[in-house]
């Protein structure tokens, strides 16, 4: 019995030390773990005894904040349509923001006639009931909204659940995987596509060298380095892999060798595919599991073995490292 208590004590001590070393606040870890900051504070101060399952959850979530982790996950684009014209309700009750602090403009995009914005958080509306209210968060908008969620002691999961309960229709969800150590080699993946060492639901791919014109749909196409698209850009599921370090070099002047993120792998989902991804997120509360299950379902890179059928070719080692369980170690 004493051994179990000691083990639990060590777990809590290690949790607290790692959290502080990672520069993560109690509030941020608590939100990620689905508990309140007050509850986590009581656990760390030994005033509350957590269950084994909760301790495991806390350690698992804390591991995602490890600044030395080779891969990290984030939401990079969110577009949701709400079947209502009550924009104040969406802003107050779903986003939980104050409309009085938002900028109102008498124009919009996507044929909407007006919009409210707070930084890069945009909410569009019009008099057309069929169009309803549209929320759009691009990359910077997602990062800004995360700060508000943290202040609200909510997670992305809480927000998405609120949106679905209110009848929100998922129009687009992008999940981004940041490669901090160069696990992926984009030119190598492009060459494997050319050599047909790529198995996927779609054979379509496009590869652009640095500086080449990328489809107009990219907001920062002039900054993106070598870029590989897997799948048709017109489909409801496709992937975009590009050199994030090059983007930061061109935009901010950050030397390539000092870039925090080397490559970015984006999973872009629309309509029904976006809805099913959100449903999976709200089933497992594990964005990493959802992201890699989608990747594994749609694409894998292999090494040619002439004496075997293509479906039996060996998984490419670098790709296996990227999608495998050992990527966290």
Task: Identify what each model region corresponds to.
Residues 34-50:
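Recognition helix of helix-turn-helix/homeodomain-like DNA-binding domains
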Residues 51-67:
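DNA major-groove recognition helix of helix-turn-helix/homeodomain DNA-binding modules
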Residues 2-3, 8, 21, 65-328:
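Structured, helix-rich domain cores that form ligand/interaction pockets
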Residues 13-32, 57:
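Short basic helix-loop element that most often maps to the first helix and adjoining turn
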Residues 26, 38, 44, 264-266:
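Acidic-residue sensor for enzyme active/binding pockets
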Residues 7-11, 35:
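Alpha-helix N-cap/N′ positions at the starts of helices
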